[in-house]
Design a protein with these regions (language model features):
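A Trp-anchored, charged/polar loop motif used as the substrate-binding/catalytic surface
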Residues: 130-147
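C-terminal domain-boundary segment and adjacent tail
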Residues: 6, 74-75, 106-115, 159-207
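Well-ordered, non-membrane alpha-helical segments in soluble/globular domains
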Residues: 25-31, 66, 136-141, 172-179
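Short, surface-exposed basic-aromatic patches at helix termini and helix-loop junctions that form
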Residues: 97-104
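Metal-dependent polysaccharide deacetylase catalytic core of the NodB/CE4 family, i.e.
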Residues: 1-95, 114-124, 153-164
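A generic secondary-structure signal
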Residues: 68, 72-76, 142-146, 182
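Gly/Pro-rich active-site loop or hairpin
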Residues: 123-131
Length: 207
């Protein structure tokens, strides 16, 4: 096996009002009563109950946001949530410790690694790249060219779903579909959720 491929999309929080700096794209697309059908079979993760930068929040506010977000999503989807995506990439040792104490197995930051390494710390899970960055396509092509070695590789791409409505460069649904088509159906890649990629790494590392 060459490696694992995993993807993360963030959607606009239902019922949360923001003064978004890019009002020319629609953020609230899927009604709450349709989300279970739309996201059936997908892994669900928290992102802050009110999109708070948890690393900059007071301890009580941080804990309340994590607890409320986790409880709401678990009630809606009827599943246990074990993953988190830091809003604005904001985190801290206290935030990470609290997430682990609440049963979280991983949490993603936004700063790209530009490579294919598994995370040393799943609570500080760095993606390979954002899908809308100019280097995303080149990174995917480099991943496909890599020869299997002693260590498995991880291609981890993320984006906000509304960014695909920008219709500029990589930030379009057309570009996204072409990229996924270019990497789909390969026997040397395991396509998995964020949670599964973390579990695979921990198992191989004997942790």
């Amino acid at each position: 096996m060459k490696g694992l491929g995993t993807f993360s999309f963030q959607d606009c929080p239902e019922g949360v009002k923001h003064k978004w700096p890019f009002s020319y794209v629609q953020h609230n697309r899927i009604p709450l009563d349709e989300v279970c059908q739309v996201y059936e079979g997908m892994e669900i993760a928290t992102h802050g109950f009110r999109h708070e930068p948890l690393g900059l929040s007071g301890e009580d506010e941080m804990r309340a946001s994590v607890d409320a977000d986790k409880a709401a999503l678990e009630k809606i989807f009827g599943t246990t949530v074990v993953g988190h995506a830091y809003a604005q990439g904001s985190t801290s040792p206290a935030v990470q410790a609290y997430l682990k104490a609440q049963g979280y197995q991983y949490a993603r930051v936004v700063f790209p690694s530009g490579g294919f390494a598994f995370p040393d710390d799943p609570m500080n899970f760095r993606p390979s790249s954002s899908l809308i960055l100019k280097n995303a396509v080149k990174l995917v092509e480099r991943f496909k060219r890599e020869e299997p070695g002693e260590k498995d590789l991880l291609l981890f791409l993320w984006a906000h779903s509304y960014e695909m409505d920008y219709e500029k460069g990589n930030a379009s649904w057309y570009a996204l579909e072409r990229l996924f088509e270019s990497i789909a159906g390969r026997s040397d890649i395991v396509y998995c959720t964020n949670r599964r990629s973390v579990r695979a790494y921990l198992r191989r590392a004997g942790k």
